[in-house]
Amino acid sequence: FNLPSPLEKLELSTFGVKQKVYVKRDDLIHPIVSGNKWRKLNFNFRFYHNNNYSGVISMGGAFSSHIQSLSFICCQKNIPCVIFIRGQKPKILNDILKQCEINNTKLIFLSKSDYSNNIAIQEICMKNWPNYYFIPEGGSNRYGIEGCQEIINEIDMEFDEIFCEVGTGTTLAGLASSCDKNKKVRGVVVLKGAENISNQVEKNYINLFNRPLNNNVQYLHQYHFGGYAKHSMELINFIRVFYKETGIKTDPIYSCLLYTSPSPRDQ
């Protein structure tokens, strides 16, 4: 693992950006367990090893990088792994699901209604795997947040604002809770119609840490390009130009939306 990840200055004058912009290259941490996936899983596995668990259970979508990372780590550490997958099992597995099976991960496919039934899933886990450690979807628990706090701890320079993508809000909570209160954290929400995400993140943080999250967060809802994982030729062209100018690969679901947000360009 390449830690701490490098902090690189970006030359974005081509895009009309005049301010100094730096990017924390968590995409270089590991070829598979990269980005915030390692951040959110690292402390969870520390907790797992410090307790007498016999396996790991989690959840995710069929294209989730969380399940890909979790399956890989469990395989490397010889930890039994069970993952509930949202949606019916496809006739042809995608590359992520194929790799999970190669890693000897047990995949259980659930309908969307069954997948959202938390009580039923808890009962299944307790009945079949009572001594397995449960990691929420995306690693969105206390240890996931604490892992993301390490991002700020690795930055030894002053900055005015920090931007991140927002899915579950775990990374944003980690950043906001470890920043000085005078530093602004802006979250680019990747889901359409997720206006309640701020309340969810705040409520979850209070439940986990018994204190409110720093009041230094702004959620940006207008950069999802029509909804989660949706994209246009405009977005694809931006990805190509951005890679040509910076050498940084982005994806149309998360990281690209971060760079198409107003960020320093319009601030």
What name fits each language-model region?
Residues 39-86:
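Active-site cofactor/substrate anionic-group-binding motifs, chiefly glycine-
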Residues 68-112, 195-208:
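Active-site-proximal loop->helix
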Residues 89-157, 218-237:
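Small/polar-residue-rich loop-to-helix segments that shape phosphate-bearing ligand pockets
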